[in-house]
């Protein structure tokens, strides 16, 4: 597993490296680790508290802002290890901890979600080099779609 690089002049995490690591851990089920990805957030106690509070529960849910045009200025990803509970599998099935994505919006709201559709949308966003910052926000709408397994959320770029 590669390490997160720190830009020593600004004391900020390199966003692309941190995201790559988080996605790799989400896909492989590597050890539990939370990374706070700083792009334009300052590395201060106040900024760290804001990120922590957002990751503990966003100010709104994806379903609350369906169809609304928003600007994403930052993203954090928290990943977990896939754990198997030993014993009778009928009573103790394999438990998987899903990655949590937190979106920071330009209007100050935060959206935290475990949605597979939004995790997939973030992977595609980064694959297309759309890395949101305050200077270059990712303009999109949150959408709700129906698939073969029911309703899911995703992002539509504007």
What is the predicted function of each stretch?
Residues 2-105, 147-158:
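OB-fold ssDNA-binding interfaces and closely related basic DNA-contact patches used
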Residues 65, 121-141:
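Short nucleic-acid-contacting surface segments enriched for D/E, G, S/T with interspersed K/R
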Residues 101-130:
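Acidic, glycine-rich flexible loop segments
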Residues 137-151:
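A short, charged
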């Amino acid at each position: 597993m590669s390490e997160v690089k720190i830009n020593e002049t600004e004391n900020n995490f390199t966003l692309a490296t941190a995201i790559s690591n988080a996605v790799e851990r989400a896909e492989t089920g590597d050890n539990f680790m939370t990374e706070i990805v700083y792009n334009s957030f300052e590395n201060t106690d106040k900024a760290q508290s804001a990120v922590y509070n957002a990751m503990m529960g966003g100010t709104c849910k994806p379903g609350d802002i369906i169809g609304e045009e928003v600007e994403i200025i930052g993203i954090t990803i928290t990943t977990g290890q896939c754990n198997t509970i030993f014993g009778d599998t009928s009573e103790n099935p394999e438990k998987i901890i899903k990655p949590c994505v937190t979106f920071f919006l330009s209007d100050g709201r935060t959206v935290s979600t475990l949605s597979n559709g939004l995790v997939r949308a973030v992977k595609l966003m980064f694959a297309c080099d759309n890395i949101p910052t305050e200077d270059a926000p990712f303009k999109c709408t949150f959408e709700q779609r129906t698939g073969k397994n029911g309703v899911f959320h995703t992002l539509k770029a504007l």
